[in-house]
């Protein structure tokens, strides 16, 4: 039973007695399949970005943020440590999807994240782009998204957490 989350962790995230495997990054792979109630998979996310308008729920497991940015239970469940962010980017499925959907975002005929996402999701997207831009060393598709939609300005809270000055 060690490969499953303990019951107290399941209770914290509202999934008591559901056998969610605690393999590295499993929560993102499961999320991106679209099997979670009221959430949609990666294919839906990509189609929505290509159409220029996010309409359903999927941002947490497609564009994760650094742990410590929020107290929202779902967002924090999908938040990543620096180690997990590096593993996410290097993962053959998750990393390639993150690059693919970020590239698709560059092709959207808009220059305002709020016109593509809601205001709150625009903040989440900027935080995720900041995280993955920094761990990829900059000069990446993530920097291009920041340049196009955020005037090149990274999320200061993400940077402070990554720099160790905000916990």
Regions found by a protein language model. Give the residues of each.
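Conserved, aromatic- and glycine-enriched, well-ordered alpha/beta core segments
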Residues: 4-123
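A charged, amphipathic interaction segment
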Residues: 99-167
